[in-house]
Amino acid sequence: MRVLCAFPEAMPSSNSRPPACLAPGALYLALLLHLSLSSQAGDRRPLPVDRAAGLKEKTLILLDVSTKNPVRTVNENFLSLQLDPSIIHDGWLDFLSSKRLVTLARGLSPAFLRFGGKRTDFLQFQNLRNPAKSRGGPGPDYYLKNYEDDIVRSDVALDKQKGCKIAQHPDVMLELQREKAAQMHLVLLKEQFSNTYSNLILTARSLDKLYNFADCSGLHLIFALNALRRNPNNSWNSSSALSLLKYSASKKYNISWELGNEPNNYRTMHGRAVNGSQLGKDYIQLKSLLQPIRIYSRASLYGPNIGRPRKNVIALLDGFMKVAGSTVDAVTWQHCYIDGRVVKVMDFLKTRLLDTLSDQIRKIQKVVNTYTPGKKIWLEGVVTTSAGGTNNLSDSYAAGFLWLNTLGMLANQGIDVVIRHSFFDHGYNHLVDQNFNPLPDYWLSLLYKRLIGPKVLAVHVAGLQRKPRPGRVIRDKLRIYAHCTNHHNHNYVRGSITLFIINLHRSRKKIKLAGTLRDKLVHQYLLQPYGQEGLKSKSVQLNGQPLVMVDDGTLPELKPRPLRAGRTLVIPPVTMGFYVVKNVNALACRYR
C-alpha cells in the first residue's frame, strides 16, 4: 500500500490525483504517538544526515497493518522472468545449460519464463534433423557451437532431483562467446533503433535447450509464437506454429502459449497493421490448434501483449476483448519507464516517474472489466529503460527503486503477475550480466521471492503531513507495502508479516510499529549499494555484508539482522529494505 508520510515533496502535476493515505483510527494512532515518544531514541547510532533535515527526523511515523483479511491475493508466480529471442542471434541460448545460470534462475522459482520480445514475430521454427549441416560449413560459429555441444556431452552433471543437463563451460569458451555477443550487440541495437529486424531460426535442438533450462530451473515456459506470418487476406498463417506445437507435444513439453508481441507496432515493423478484431480471431484459431493436441488441450493462453495504453492501443485492446476476451486466461500488456538514451541516475528517484504506472493500470482494467469482469491481468516485459537499457544505470542499485515500487504497486492494484524483462540477454535491463554475475535487481528479486507471499495487506500510517497548495499534489517519497510472509520460508511461522520500504528522502526516517505489530520481534533485511560508486554500484550489501555467490551451485545465505521488540525502525536515506514482523499471528496469513 503506497502511503504519504512526513514532509513529502510537493511537485506540480496537472493530471495526477493525490495518492490515497489510509489512516483509520487516527485518534488511536495519535494516542500511540504520544505514548511512543520515549522510544524514538531506539537507535542512537549517528548517520550522515543534512543539518537542514534535522527537524524532519523528529517526526515519528506510526505504522499499522490490517491483519484480518488480505486486500488482494496475487499469483504464486507473481514475480516472473523473460528471455528475449535475441539470445538465438547472439549465441547465448547455447549457454543456458550453465550450472551458474541454472542456480541463479532456481533462486527465483517458482515463476513463469516467457520466451518472447520484439523478435518474436520474426521467429521461425525448423525441425532440422542435423543442425550441424545447416551452419554452412566450418567457421567461428561452427567451432564455438560444436565445442559447446562437446562440453555438454562430456561434462554433463546430472541433477539429482530432475536429471537435468547442466554444463561447466571452460573460461576460454565463455570468452569467445562474450566477444561474439559484443559484436552482435551492435547489430541488435542497430535493428532496434531502425525498427527493422532480421528473421531468426529456432531449431528443434534450440527448443530442447530452452525447455531444459526452464524445467531444470523450476520455471514454467510460456512461448510467444510469431503472429506476423500472414495470409493474403491478413489472417494468421499458422503453418510454422503448428510444426512447433507438434514437435513440443512429441517431447511432452509442458508449455503455455502466446501469439505475437506488441501488435500495435506491426505497421511500423512490417508495413501491415493487424487490428484488435483480427488479432482476436487469430487467438481463437490458435486455441483451435491447441485443443486437438492432447497435452495442450487445456494449455493456458495469454495475450494480446500490447504496448503502453495510448488511445490507439486501447482501441486495439477493445477490439481484441470483444472477440477473444474469453479465450485468453490472462490479459497482458507491457511497460517501459524511461527512454534509455537520455536517462540520468536521479531519474530513478523521481516520484512522478514511479507513479506513471498507476494510471496505465486503471486504463487496462477499465477495458478488461467492461468485457470480462474479474479476468486476470498481467504486466509482461516491464523494463526500467528502453533501447536495451543504459550501462551503469539500468543495471545499478538506483534502478532497484523503480523495480521494487513496481512490484508493490502492481500487487496492491490487483495485477496478477509481473514478468521482468529480462533475466539474461543483451543490453543492461537484465538481472544477470554476461559474466553470469547477479546484478542489484537480482538480489532484490531474490529477497522478494524469499520473504513476500501472495497475500497483500492494507497499510495504515499516522504522522505529520503537509497540505498541498491548490493545483499541486504531494508525492510520497517514503513508500511502504505489506504482505503476508512467504509461507514457503520455514524460518518464519505462518501469521508473520513482511514490510518492504523505499526511502527516497535524503534523510533517514523513523517508523514505530503500532497496533497488532507493536512490541513484536523484527528481522531486518536492509539492501544498500556496496563500493565507491554509490547509487551506480553494480554490487549490493545486505545488512552491511556484500552479497556474492558462494560458488556456481550455491547462493549465499540471506542473513537478517534481528531487532529487539518495540525498537523503532530507522530507514537510512535513499535505501530500500524488507522487515519481517515475526509471530504476529495475523489471521489473513495463517492459511494459504
UniProtKB/Swiss-Prot annotation:
Annotated disulfide bonds: none
Q: Which residues are the signal sequence here?
A: 1-41
GO CC terms in record = extracellular matrix; extracellular space; plasma membrane
Which coarse location class applies to the principal site listed for this UniProt protein? secreted
Q: What does the record give under GO molecular function?
A: heparan sulfate proteoglycan binding; heparanase activity
* Tissues in which the protein is found: Widely expressed, with the highest expression in brain, mammary gland, prostate, small intestine, testis and uterus. In the central nervous system, expressed in the spinal cord, caudate nucleus, thalamus, substantia nigra, medulla oblongata, putamen and pons. In the urinary bladder, expressed in longitudinal and circular layers of detrusor muscle. Found both in normal and cancer tissues.
Glycosylation annotated at which residues? 254, 392
Q: Does the keyword Signal apply?
A: yes
Which GO biological-process labels does this protein carry?
Answer: cell population proliferation; extracellular matrix organization; positive regulation of cell population proliferation
The job of this chain, per UniProt, is described as:
Binds heparin and heparan sulfate with high affinity, but lacks heparanase activity. Inhibits HPSE, possibly by competing for its substrates (in vitro).
Subunit composition and interactions:
Interacts with HPSE. Interacts with SDC1 (via glycan chains).
Protein name (Swiss-Prot/TrEMBL)? Inactive heparanase-2
Give the species this sequence originates from.
Homo sapiens
